[in-house]
Structures are given as C-alpha cells and as structure tokens.
Amino acid sequence: MESIRIGVLGLTNAGKSTLVNQLHKANNLLVSPMNNTTLLAVSTNTITHEKQNITFIDVPGFSEKRHSSYELISQEIRKALSGIDVLLLVVRSDQQQKLPLLQTQLQPLKRYRDLTRVLLINNFFDVVLQAEDKQAIVLDFKPQAVLETDLLHFDATSFWNQFNEVKLQANEFRKDVEFLDADTDNFKILEALREQIIKYCSEEIPHVVRLEIVDKSFDQAKNLLKLHLSISVPKLSQKKIIIGRNAQMVKKIGMQMRQKLLEYYDCNVFVELFVRTYDPKQKKSPYGSLI
C-alpha cells in the first residue's frame, strides 16, 4: 500500500492543527488563538484511505521576520517541505489583512515543483474569500485542486469526498525526514505543559520557553506516574513570571497540567516543575528531550 505524507501549511491561525485534529477525531495537537502555537513540524497517526496510508504533518504557520521564533519556524517549514509528497495549503477566508504576507511566502514554494498541491479554503464563520483574493492565491500557488470547508462545522465526509478528486502522487525526491510524533507519551506530556504556559503567561514566553522531561517513572504499587520537568527561559524576568509570587503561578501551571494528563492516563499523576534560565546563544529545541 502506497504511503503518502501530506504537509499542512499556511498562515498562523488558519486552522491547520484544527483540521488535523478533526480528521483524527482527537485533540492531540494544541490549538490556541495565540499566533504560532505550533513551533515544530509534527507527524500524526496514519489514516488508511482509498488504498493509501496517509500521514498528515502539521507544519508551523508562516511568520514575520520580527517574530522571536522566525528562524526556528522557517527551518521547520523547509524541513517539512523536503519530507512530504503533498502540500495542503490552508487559507482562512477572514484573514484578508494577512494575504500580502501569504503571497510573499508562496514565492519560495515554487521551487518545490514535485509536490502535489491542494488549496483548502476555510470559510471561517461563513465568511467567503473574495474572488479576486482567491484568484491571486490560485495563480501564485497553482494547486491541482481547490477544496472548501468550514472547520468550525467540519464535515469529514464532505472533506474526503472533495479530497477523492485529487490524484495524490508520491514525491520521488522526498527525503526520509523524521518528525515529532504527536501520539507518543512524551509529546503529550510536554504539550500539556506548554498549553498551560500559553494559557497563563504572556505571549512572549511560550515562544522562547524550552521544555524537557528530566525524569519519568511509574510506581506500579501506587498506580502513580511521576514526572519531573524542566522549564527553561532566556531571561531572569521571564523565570520570575513563570514562578509567580510565592510560587503561585508555577503551582497553578503544574496543577492544570496534571488535570490535562488525567484525561490521557488511567492512573494518578505527580508533577514537579523546575524553572531555570538558559543562555540564548545556545540553540535549544522547544522540546529538548524529544529531539
């Protein structure tokens, strides 16, 4: 059976992670109104469809150069493009003000001529993408097919019916790229922690924070999963924000993270968090123990 990797790309907050979650009927990928929630390209479980094994790769959204994680995100996008067969571009219909950025980002994609290209228009809140904007994107992107959906009221059957019209082809030049696996325990643990940092801390911190599993063990007699995790940030001021007055913030983050993990695991969970600083000159992965 042929294996196809589909990279889901687009502007930040276009609905890329939401689409992949909907197709898997799961919430493994973190979704947030914050820009660039996804920092690394993430692989998901394989879906068997029409005699093909399809793996969706959730790719970080296009960002502007002034973004603190611009270099990391750009690197991840390039890595993803070299390791996929199909490029699925998601465009949200109400993001007209971001279309100039999108069209700028589409120019470098022209060199990836061997990828099957599909344009998916997310009709957000039933807002229709203006005809001239749609035409401009089609001219730049040159998709083999244009699909439309509303991810807030997603109909998987309708999506697959449209998708069946696309002739998916393996890319003979695809590299054997290794992506983060969204279905592993370690990824779920670190994403649960990152979700709380996004929820409770300023927008600057989630993009520079580096997370690591220092120790993980299971006490079978007590049915207890013990987690010791490290949160690293480049500035002392950011460390103080995460810790909070009388350590109230880091306690809240740990408690809410534990509640999230209880949805995954049929056992008790103990979480201990350490907050430290790292030298910003050192290039550290957002998920130190997974790379």
Curated annotation (Swiss-Prot):
It holds the Pfam family KH_2. GO terms for molecular function: GTP binding; GTPase activity; ribosomal small subunit binding; small ribosomal subunit rRNA binding. It is found in: Cytoplasm; Cell membrane. Residues 2-144 form the Era-type G domain. Keywords: Cell membrane, Cytoplasm, GTP-binding, Membrane, Nucleotide-binding, Ribosome biogenesis, RNA-binding, rRNA-binding. GTP binds at residues 10-17, 58-62. Its main location: cytoplasm. InterPro entries: G_ERA_dom, GTP-bd, GTPase_Era-like, KH_dom-like_a/b, KH_dom_type_2, KH_sf_prok-type, P-loop_NTPase. It is a peripheral membrane protein. Monomer. An essential GTPase that binds both GDP and GTP, with rapid nucleotide exchange. Plays a role in 16S rRNA processing and 30S ribosomal subunit biogenesis and possibly also in cell cycle regulation and energy metabolism. Belongs to the TRAFAC class TrmE-Era-EngA-EngB-Septin-like GTPase superfamily. Era GTPase family. HAMAP family: GTPase_Era (MF_00367). This is GTPase Era. The lineage of its organism: Bacteria, Bacillati, Mycoplasmatota, Mycoplasmoidales, Mycoplasmoidaceae.
